[in-house]
Each structure stands twice: as C-alpha cells, then as structure tokens.
Amino acid sequence: MAAKQVLFSDEARAKMLDGVNTLANAVKVTLGPKGRNVVLDKSFGTPTITKDGVSVAKEIELEDKFENMGAQIVKEVASKTADVAGDGTTTATVLAQALLTEGLKAVAAGMNPMDLKRGIDKATARLVEELKALSKPCSDPKSIEQVGTISANSDATVGKLIADAMAKVGKEGVITVEEGKGFEDELDVVEGMQFDRGYLSPYFATNQENMTTDLENPYILIVDKKISNIRDLLPILEGVSKSGRALLIIAEDVESEALATLVVNNMRGVVKVCAVKAPGFGDRRKAMLEDIATLTGATFVSEDLSMKLEETNMEHLGTASRVQVTKDNTTIIDGAGEKEAIAKRINVIKANIAEANSDYDREKLQERLAKLSGGVAVIKVGAVTEAEMKEKKDRVDDALHATRAAVEEGIVAGGGVALIRAQKALDGLTGENDDQNYGIALLRKAIEAPLRQIVSNAGGESSVVVNQVKANQGNYGYNAANDTYGDMVEMGILDPTKVTRSALQHAASIAGLMITTEAMIGEIKEAAPAMPMGGGMGGMPGMM
C-alpha cells in the first residue's frame, strides 16, 4: 500500500479552501445575464466556449491533491443541483464558497465547528420553508417562456421553443433536444414514447460525455422473457449485423453471460446493440410491451402467444427513426407502426379506462394512453459552428430541466431576490448557544452572495445594489441586463423554486461537512525514477 500524507486542522482546511476558491472563482464568472464565458480546452477538436456553470466545474482537476479534494467536493454541489433541478449550479457554488470562507474563519477564531453546522442547518430549514411560502405556481405559457429564457442565459428564442413544446405535448410530455441540420432552431412533434428503464450496461453508451446511447433508424426486438442464452439471438444478430443498422432489445432481463456477449460485440463494432429492461411489472408489463410493439411495428415475442425467441427472424423486428437511451429512460421517436393499428390500440385503452374499477388502474391506463397518443416534441438546435452548437444545446437542456422544475414546484423572483426576501424568516431565530447563533448569522450573510456576484459580473457596485434591494419589499430587485430596478416578476426575471431551494440545501450541506473536517488523507506522489545513463560507444578494434 502506498504511503499516505495526513494534514490536520487549520492546515487541512486552508488547503481545502484554496481548492474551493479555484473552482468557484472559475464558475462564478458565468452567473447572471452579463456573466462571462469560460473557454474549455479539449484533447481534440475545437475548444468549447460556455456559460454553463456545471460544464466549467466538471473540467477542473487540480494538481495539488488536497486542494483537489476541496474542488471535487464543491463540484459535487454543482452536479447534485444539476441532477435534481437542472439549473442553479453556479448559485450553489457561490453559496458554498461564501459559507465556507466565513465558516472557516470562525473555526480558526476558536468557535465550535459542530455548533456552527447546527446553526447553518437550522437556518437552512427555516429558509426552505420561507422559499416555499414565497413560491407562486407556474402554469401559464408566459411564465413558462420567461423561466426558459432566464435559464438559457436570457435567450428568448429558447424560452419560446420550450413553451411551445410544452403546449403541444403537455407539461408532463416527452421533450428531447438534438442537434439540427440548419442555422435556425426548429420544433417538431413526432409519434413517440418514453418509458422509465435505461440501458442494462453503461458500455452500451455511444456518447461518453452525456452517457447516452443514440441509435439512428434501429431495429427493435421486444421479448417478454429473460434472455439467458445468446444462441437464441444469433439469427437476429447476424441479420442486423449484415444490414449495418443498430438493434434495440427490450426484454424482461438479459442475464450476465448473454449481456457480456452483447457488450463485447457492441464494443468491437460487430453489431451496434443496446439492451434495456422492459417497463412495468406482471400483466401491466405485457400490456406496455404490446403498446411498444404496436408503435414500432414489431411482433411481440411471447410464449403466451406461442412464439419462441429462437424462432424469431428479421420480419419480427420493429423500427423507429431514432432511439435515445440514458441510464434511467428510453425514448423511442417516430416508430414505424401502422397508424390504423396505433389508433385501434388507443381505442382499446380508452375502453379499458371506462371499465376500470380502481383509481390506481385508471391512472396507469391513462399513463399508457398518454405515452401512446401524446407524441414526443423534438427541439432541433441550429447554429453556425460546431462549438456554438454544443454550447447552445447544453443551454437548451438546462433551460428545459429548469422549466420542468418551475412547473413542478412553482417560481420565485429571480436575480437573487428570493433569497434576500427569505432573510426576514431568520429574524428572531436563535440557536442553543452563541456559536449556533453565529452559524445562523453566517447563512444570513451568505445568501446575499448570488446577488452580489450578478452585480459584480455586470460591472456594478454590489454593496450599493444589495442595500437598495433590501430597503424595498416584495419582488423589487435589480435587472443586471439593463441596469434598472423594478418588479422582477413583471420584468420576466424568474427562478424555479426547486432550483433556488436545491442550490441552498446542497451548498449548506457541503459547507457544513467541510467546516467540520479535522483531517485530510492523501497518497504521497512517488517521484518518477531517474532515467539510466546512456552507455558510451565501445572503442572500435584496430584503432590507436
């Protein structure tokens, strides 16, 4: 085992803070409508230019291992916030940095770290309650468009696209984002379906950056049993390999030996394949598989229907124009099923809904109906260059996630104003001792940091703006885009409540853990062995 280096107390915390500051200082310049760009170097191809906080955070690896630990912990704040709410990564990073900077000063001055953490936790719980109280529902198209615009870094065309997509497929409908062929953004609604099962192995992923599998014009095999013997699949795999197309397998399960064979063949390029588990359970699973078979024009391979897997051939496969698989979901777009068969299937489900006895059965049938009839909205992102395309696609993805979060939990005034207004909930809140009270005061001050950073990025004087906003009430705030004050909601500057809440909770959680850190352990980097000296050339015989 390699020797380890151990740092304690202030030395450990100082190293950790250096790492946090390096990452946070790179991320926070992107905050707000006048946030700056960050250029990310790539091992090949053009550098990426982005204003997306989580993309910047993901690129940062520091040489000093102890500083890197601090950076990686705060990177987790950004990633967690992005996973839960789809946006707010920069806000979470700024909050974590502000809390940690002041918290570590307090610990160095002799305060009890555990009591500081308890004070921060107590204040966080109160602020979350206040944010929920300040929240307003987001249901009308105008609010949805405004949230999408803000989350896409004030790009109004993206906000309108997302609002239009939600209007066409419903707020719970499936919306996907893909790269377009032209310079303009487009919105298409196609026949499609999404279900909550992802790939059985991450080795099926074709896009390593996003860990997604994208299959263009694939064949689709639908089976209701476990696949344990790869021999049963050989005729299908050979046929698909000859065709040069991809194959999506939807089955109850694929057991280890068969799965390993599929993975190896996929990685070697023998046949492009992806296997996913069938959605649902029991009879409901069979019904959902029949829905997918109808949508894609596949034959449902089931022993109940006297069909065995080893007897299947290419004629039993369905097709779709595109399939996207993530670790959690599978989206089938534009299946090749006959319109008459799909309409007939929809009518059968409608009849079942009318006859359903329980609310649960009715709800599940309505889910199936929505999947089969709702379609999928596809936002095609247009751009002039590949670098612009990638950056814009990331922004549209973020905006889509944030808009869904707004529909789910409502909206609050944006631009850091909601956190300033929530400060009043901490009036009169006290802990069990002075150190806990200081923890509460720490968070009270830290929640001003996002507004201060927005103003700083816009070239303004943050203290003046913060005092002006605090002197007023309600949704009154600062619009950094045009350097004016006013009602943030009326100006269309909104944040999803879920985004603000998640950013606050994740930042407070990580800051509390780091404040209470007393030791850090890392491997000692071994020095590379010196190169051996080159041998001299031997004397040639016969020379004097």
Swiss-Prot record:
Cellular component GO terms, alphabetical: cytoplasm
GO MF, one example: ATP-dependent protein folding chaperone
One BP annotation, GO: protein refolding
Enzyme class: isomerase
Record localization: Cytoplasm
Superkingdom: Bacteria
InterPro entries: Chaperonin_Cpn60_CS, Cpn60/GroEL, Cpn60/GroEL/TCP-1, GroEL-like_apical_dom_sf, GROEL-like_equatorial_sf, TCP-1-like_intermed_sf
Binding, ATP: 30-33, 51, 87-91, 415, 479-481, 495
Keywords, ordered alphabetically: ATP-binding, Chaperone, Cytoplasm, Isomerase, Nucleotide-binding
EC number(s) per entry: 5.6.1.7
Catalysed reaction, written as an equation: ATP + H2O + a folded polypeptide = ADP + phosphate + an unfolded polypeptide
Family assignment from sequence similarity: Belongs to the chaperonin (HSP60) family.
Protein's job: Together with its co-chaperonin GroES, plays an essential role in assisting protein folding. The GroEL-GroES system forms a nano-cage that allows encapsulation of the non-native substrate proteins and provides a physical environment optimized to promote and accelerate protein folding.
Assembly with partners or alone: Forms a cylinder of 14 subunits composed of two heptameric rings stacked back-to-back. Interacts with the co-chaperonin GroES.
PANTHER family reported in the protein's UniProt record: 60 KDA HEAT SHOCK PROTEIN, MITOCHONDRIAL
NCBIfam families: GroEL (TIGR02348), PRK00013.1 (NF000592), PRK12849.1 (NF009487), PRK12850.1 (NF009488), PRK12851.1 (NF009489)
Listed name of the protein: Chaperonin GroEL
Organism of this sequence: Francisella tularensis subsp. tularensis (strain SCHU S4 / Schu 4)
Gene name of this polypeptide: groEL
